[in-house]
């Protein structure tokens, strides 16, 4: 099957998936000025760079609740999970659609469209029997080993992460570093601790 990598509503390139989703192959670059940054820094190996870019739009198998998420969404693998929401990420404006699809950025982005309450993905609530496995969410495109979800709180989009292992120290570390950077008045992203 062939897909289009989009940057908002700009068609960037067309690609095909081979080897049971283990490799994507570029069919045609339509707008080189809009390729992802990692493809610009690897100009002689664009296909490998595209595969790395696509791979970073999946929930990794190393995430502690990977199998639970697959079961919840009735998906075979992380690729299928991510593709259901067009591989939209909150971190950038790229997304993927089938070449014959008329879907637009306005239809799929989560800056302007609601983000579903996915707290079940980090174990904060236990309502699996009420969960719609076919709804679109940016949380099936989150890379990283920590359990995490994007959510709307008022006018803000926040990333909520859960700690792992015995001390659950990762969220604490990020909050402390955020405070240190604020003290030194350098650009940073604010992290704070909350309990869910």
Predicted regions and their residues:
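Regulatory N- and C-terminal appendages and interdomain linkers associated
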Residues: 1-135
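Conserved ATP-binding subdomain of kinase catalytic cores across diverse folds
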Residues: 107-196
């Amino acid at each position: 099957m062939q897909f289009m990598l989009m940057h908002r509503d700009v068609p960037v390139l067309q690609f095909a998936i081979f080897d049971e989703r283990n490799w994507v192959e570029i069919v045609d670059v339509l707008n080189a000025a809009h390729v992802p940054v990692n493809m610009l820094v690897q100009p002689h190996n664009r296909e490998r760079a595209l595969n790395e870019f696509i791979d970073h739009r999946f929930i990794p198998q190393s995430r502690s609740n990977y199998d639970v998420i697959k079961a919840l969404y009735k998906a075979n693998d992380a690729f299928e999970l991510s593709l259901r929401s067009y591989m939209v990420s909150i971190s950038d404006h790229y997304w993927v659609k089938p070449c014959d699809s008329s879907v637009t950025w306005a239809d799929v982005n989560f800056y302007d469209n609601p983000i579903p309450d996915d707290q079940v993905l980090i174990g904060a609530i236990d309502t699996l029997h009420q969960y719609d496995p076919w709804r679109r969410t940016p949380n099936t495109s989150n890379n990283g080993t920590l359990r995490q979800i994007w959510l709307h709180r008022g006018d803000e989009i926040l990333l909520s992460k859960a700690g792992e292992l015995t001390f659950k120290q990762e969220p604490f570390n990020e909050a402390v570093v955020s405070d240190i950077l604020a003290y030194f008045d350098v650009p940073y992203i604010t992290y704070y601790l909350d309990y869910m």
